[in-house]
């Protein structure tokens, strides 16, 4: 506790009402946010002589000031506490790192509705189904539905531009409403069945399809009956793969496990009795935090995140009880205007779901701990191999990627003692150099990385360069220039490919002395170097391919006078890609919003050249 903070004097001013408190350190940064039913009683507990909790002792030792906000009720205090935690991200709070909104399937409100992936604010009119645990689950579901229901998934601009059916129609995954190859009645019937399917009512869909197949067969419409038969077969195959409970309804099932400083909350999303998917969360947990506080903090931030598109079900099952369960349920009801039950003691199928979630959480933590131990061991071996007197906390690796000098991209990936730190990854688009000049590309990337670097900046202990002595010399020269006024420059090591480019035969080169050395193929230190090198290569080539594709899609259009970014985007979206634009007639080009007949002729002539 700061010498300037007088706890006794402060506590005399605190009320016994419910509210929220913010603790500040000497730098005026919020280090902890908490809530209390009785502020005076709760805050007094921090300043007792014998504090058993090590984490609380550390927290109190840094307190320089405390702000208190009184609320009308404990429920209001819970909601405000969550808002403050999100705002300040305090050091001593358990922090849920989940800033992504959840994806949904959108069934649009169009004359011929489309099924689409959606993430973010629900601005488009239509029905939203979800949330799904991740984007992959949505795409998998959409791919699955294409095989069962011939409903379009193209965007509206593409739909409007069609004068003939696309490939999806040819392979039986769309009924081509864009060119009137399906009746309005039949299309809407498929939309209705898809809606029931997304609501989990598979048996109802099956009954309708069987009835329609039998009716079509009776009417001797055998081709139509065969189509219904194929739908039934596909639907039955899907239903067999899904674990369905007719009694469970909508639930979130949370398995919580915490060991050796690593916490995992594994969520099963149960919607309409069906497992929609699952997702694991790894909150940032301060050392020596009690399990009950970890669980409470996770639930608070997860369900009171006002920015999320998440829909909370009426029932939440958790593997462990925690304090203030009832208060949290009240806070959710207040925030979302929906009654929620939080349960731990359940039987039958619910208990089975809970065991499954807990098993997944336990396995996830054990896997992370194993990975963490492996990474830590490899760091120790690397320190030994290069005879480092200091502990390596941060490593970076640079790589260059291009195709014959086109669309050059440099990557910088970062590893710490827990493995890849993807939030710190960076890509650099390289410009103004001779195409294919890897030395100039490396110089530009390293210069941009360390431009205006300071003592307090994120400086790596080791900087790996994926390349030979030439690129290493360039990088070393830039680092020497940038760190001339600093005494904490990184150690540079080049990673040159071995004979036949075989893994395990790499030659390692120190940047300063240019002394080369190698490590045994089975060395854990070498495996760590290979890991960061391969990750740097992957990150560079992914960025290069994306840039190259974007360039090739637009470069042809960029040379046409009068076709700026907006018109290029409209042409590509409306017609469905560069090849479609090249193959379009003048009249088809003129249908694109913002393209006059005269401009269409100009574009047509330029592309046909």
Swiss-Prot record:
Superkingdom field: Bacteria
Keyword list, A-Z: Cytoplasm, DNA damage, DNA excision, DNA repair, Excision nuclease, SOS response
Compartments, as annotated in UniProt: Cytoplasm
GO molecular function list: DNA binding; excinuclease ABC activity
Any GO BP: SOS response
Domain UVR per the UniProt entry, residue ranges: 203-238
One Gene Ontology CC term in the entry: cytoplasm
CDD domains (alphabetical): GIY-YIG_UvrC_Cho
Cited InterPro entries: GIY-YIG_endonuc (IPR000305), GIY-YIG_endonuc_sf (IPR035901), GIY-YIG_UvrC_Cho (IPR047296), Hlx-hairpin-Hlx_DNA-bd_motif (IPR003583), RuvA_2-like (IPR010994), UVR_dom (IPR001943), UVR_dom_sf (IPR036876), UvrABC_protein_C (IPR050066)
Pfam families membership: GIY-YIG, HHH_5, UVR, UvrC_RNaseH, UvrC_RNaseH_dom
UniProt-listed SUPFAM superfamilies: C-terminal UvrC-binding domain of UvrB, GIY-YIG endonuclease, RuvA domain 2-like
Domain GIY-YIG: 16-94
Quaternary state and interactors: Interacts with UvrB in an incision complex.
Entry-linked NCBIfam families: PRK00558.1-5, uvrC
Family classification: Belongs to the UvrC family.
General function of this protein: The UvrABC repair system catalyzes the recognition and processing of DNA lesions. UvrC both incises the 5' and 3' sides of the lesion. The N-terminal half is responsible for the 3' incision and the C-terminal half is responsible for the 5' incision.
Official protein name in the record: UvrABC system protein C
Native source organism of the sequence: Shewanella pealeana (strain ATCC 700345 / ANG-SQ1)
């Amino acid at each position: 506790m700061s010498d300037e903070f007088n706890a006794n004097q402060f506590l005399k001013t605190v009320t016994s009402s419910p509210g929220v408190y913010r603790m500040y350190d000497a730098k005026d940064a919020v280090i902890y946010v908490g809530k209390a039913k009785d502020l005076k009683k709760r805050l007094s507990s921090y300043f007792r002589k014998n504090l058993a909790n090590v984490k609380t002792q550390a927290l109190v030792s840094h307190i320089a000031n405390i702000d208190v906000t009184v609320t009308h009720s404990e429920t209001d205090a819970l909601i405000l506490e969550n808002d403050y935690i999100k705002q300040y991200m305090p050091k001593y709070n358990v922090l849920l790192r989940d800033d992504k909104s959840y994806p949904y399937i959108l069934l649009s409100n169009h004359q011929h509705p489309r099924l689409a992936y959606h993430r973010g604010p629900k601005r488009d009119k239509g029905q939203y189904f979800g949330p799904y645990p991740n984007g992959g689950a949505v795409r998998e579901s959409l791919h699955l539905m294409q095989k069962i229901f011939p409903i379009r998934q193209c965007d509206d601009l593409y739909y409007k531009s069609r004068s003939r059916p696309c490939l999806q129609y040819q392979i039986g995954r769309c009924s081509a409403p864009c060119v009137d190859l399906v009746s309005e009645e039949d299309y809407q019937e498929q939309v209705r069945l898809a809606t029931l399917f997304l609501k989990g009512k598979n048996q109802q869909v099956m009954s309708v399809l069987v009835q329609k197949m039998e009716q079509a067969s009776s009417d001797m419409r055998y081709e139509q009956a065969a189509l219904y038969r194929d739908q039934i077969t596909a639907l039955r195959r899907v239903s067999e793969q899904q674990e369905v409970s007719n009694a469970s309804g909508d639930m979130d099932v949370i398995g919580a496990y915490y060991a050796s400083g690593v916490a995992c909350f594994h969520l099963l999303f149960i919607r309409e009795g069906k497992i929609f998917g699952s997702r694991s969360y790894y909150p940032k947990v301060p050392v020596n935090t009690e399990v009950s506080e970890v669980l409470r903090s996770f639930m608070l931030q997860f369900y009171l995140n006002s920015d999320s598109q998440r829909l909370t079900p009426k029932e939440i099952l958790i593997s462990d009880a925690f304090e203030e369960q009832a208060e949290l349920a009240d806070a959710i009801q207040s925030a979302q205007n929906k009654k929620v039950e939080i349960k731990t003691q359940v039987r039958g199928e619910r208990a089975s779901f809970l065991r499954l979630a807990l098993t997944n959480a336990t396995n996830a933590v054990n896997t992370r701990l194993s990975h963490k131990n492996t990474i830590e061991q490899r760091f120790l071996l690397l320190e030994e191999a290069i005879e480092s007197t200091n502990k390596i906390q941060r490593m970076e690796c640079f790589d260059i990627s291009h195709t014959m000098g086109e669309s050059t991209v440099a990557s910088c990936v970062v590893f710490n003692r827990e493995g890849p730190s993807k939030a710190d990854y960076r890509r650099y688009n390289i410009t103004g150099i001779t195409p294919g000049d890897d030395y100039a590309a490396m110089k530009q990337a390293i210069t941009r990385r360390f431009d205006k670097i300071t003592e307090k900046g994120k400086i790596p202990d080791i900087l790996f360069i994926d390349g030979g002595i030439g690129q290493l010399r360039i990088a070393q020269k830039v680092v020497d220039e940038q760190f001339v006024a600093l005494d904490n420059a990184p150690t540079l090591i080049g990673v040159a490919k071995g004979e036949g480019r075989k893994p395990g035969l790499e030659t390692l080169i120190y940047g300063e002395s240019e002394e080369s050395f190698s490590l045994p193929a089975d060395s854990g230190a070498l495996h760590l170097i290979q890991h960061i090198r391969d990750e740097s290569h992957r990150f560079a080539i992914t960025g290069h391919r994306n840039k190259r594709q974007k360039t090739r899609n637009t470069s042809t259009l960029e040379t046409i006078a009068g076709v700026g970014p907006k018109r290029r985007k409209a042409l590509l979206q409306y017609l469905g890609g560069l090849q479609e634009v090249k193959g379009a007639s003048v009249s088809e080009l003129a249908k694109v919003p913002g393209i006059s007949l005269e401009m269409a002729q100009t574009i047509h002539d330029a592309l046909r050249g």
